[in-house]
Amino acid sequence: MSKAIIAKKEKLVDDFAAELKEAKAILVIDYLGLTVEEVTNLRKDLRDANVKMKVIKNTYLKRAAEKAGIEGLEDTFVGPTAVVYTADAEDITEPARIVSKYEDDIDALSIKGGMLEGKVASQEEIKKLAAIPGREGLLSMLVSVLQAPVRNFAYAVKAVADSKDE
């Protein structure tokens, strides 16, 4: 193999290691059996959420993970593997939510494992995380809970005012 090809592969591994090092959430998925249309739709939804998906050879992935200091995911780097990751600390649940939605709809897609904020997460933990509403949903729930007493008081005052009018 020529030195130029080796240098190109080393650069690919180094670049991917840098991206993995910055990632707050990493999911390793098996995409075998997905149609081109399904992969395209998945990538589009991930891109819209500021999440990246990369299909990379397992040997390169192992080297990149090693360089990034990621341990505990090596057993997931088997067979057809894609890595879904985000460096966005705003909502680390978003990749899990999107991939889990596709996993429910498409039998061919499966989550192998992942890492969330530096901690290895099993397939079950990722599915539980995906069930939690996103930041927007949680904020709207909080606002609703905070508004409830004020709203109930306003209804009570209105009911008293209506009863006095009659």
Curated annotation (Swiss-Prot):
Q: Establish whether keyword Ribosomal protein is in the entry.
A: yes
The subunit structure is: Part of the ribosomal stalk of the 50S ribosomal subunit. The N-terminus interacts with L11 and the large rRNA to form the base of the stalk. The C-terminus forms an elongated spine to which L12 dimers bind in a sequential fashion forming a multimeric L10(L12)X complex.
Keyword terms, alphabetized: Ribonucleoprotein, Ribosomal protein, RNA-binding, rRNA-binding
Q: Which Pfam families match?
A: Ribosomal_L10
Q: Which GO terms describe its biological process?
A: translation
UniProt function note: Forms part of the ribosomal stalk, playing a central role in the interaction of the ribosome with GTP-bound translation factors.
GO molecular function of the protein, one example?
Answer: structural constituent of ribosome
Q: Which InterPro entries match?
A: Ribosomal_uL10, Ribosomal_uL10-like_sf, Ribosomal_uL10_bac, Ribosomal_uL10_bac_type, Ribosomal_uL10_CS_bac
Matches recorded under NCBIfam families? PRK00099.1-1
Would you identify the family this protein belongs to, as annotated?
Belongs to the universal ribosomal protein uL10 family.
Q: PROSITE patterns from the xrefs?
A: RIBOSOMAL_L10 (PS01109)
Annotated protein name in UniProt: Large ribosomal subunit protein uL10
